[in-house]
């Protein structure tokens, strides 16, 4: 195998690549830096995107309704991501992305959000319709156009708004599990 070390690369903390580096011991010979901020460029302006709970509430560009809608959506995605990770750990597959206990220092989403029931409306709402685009999926969750762009491009790291919602949602789960995985810094590792 060959790894190109000539240029910085983006590797999310909950990604399998980082887990492989840590398990193999190769991480001792590499340097990692957490992403401090994520930006979306639109209308000639680069705008910082709230990527964790404290950023959402500090953002003066979001209305109260937008903050509630975004937090409700991100909590639901986090809860589902944690359920998925727990299922992988119990099945013997990789579950290392859950190494920060929910509610512990370094967990950005608190403790109660993970413990949802099957009747939880937010969890049910995360079902992706066959062929649904990410933009339609986020619209169904009540996110405004600016929030849809921020979630799609900055958090799910997609390049098009009409990307498949199922793929983008899986990428968003990895991003959310990466936030503060290795400490309370802002952003994904």
Show where each model-derived region lies.
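Rossmann-like flavin
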Residues: 5-7, 18-187
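Switch I (G2) and immediately adjacent beta-strands of P-loop GTPase domains
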Residues: 1
């Amino acid at each position: 195998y060959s790894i190109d070390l000539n240029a910085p690369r983006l590797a999310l903390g909950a990604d399998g690549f980082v887990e492989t580096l840590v398990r193999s011991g190769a991480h001792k010979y590499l340097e990692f830096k957490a992403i401090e901020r994520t930006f979306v460029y639109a209308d000639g302006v680069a705008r910082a995107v709230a990527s964790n709970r404290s950023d959402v509430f500090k953002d003066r560009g979001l209305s109260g309704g937008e903050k509630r809608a975004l937090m409700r959506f991100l909590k639901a995605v986090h809860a589902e991501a944690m359920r998925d990770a727990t299922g992988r750990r119990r099945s013997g597959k990789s579950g290392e992305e859950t190494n920060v206990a929910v509610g512990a220092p370094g967990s950005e989403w608190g403790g109660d959000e993970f413990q949802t029931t099957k009747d939880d409306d937010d969890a049910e709402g995360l079902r992706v319709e066959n062929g649904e685009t990410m933009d339609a999926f986020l619209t169904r969750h009540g996110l405004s156009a600016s929030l849809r762009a921020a979630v799609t491009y900055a958090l799910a790291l997609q390049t098009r708004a009409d990307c498949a919602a199922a793929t983008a949602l899986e990428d968003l789960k990895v991003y959310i599990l990466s936030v503060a995985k290795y400490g309370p810094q802002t952003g994904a590792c």
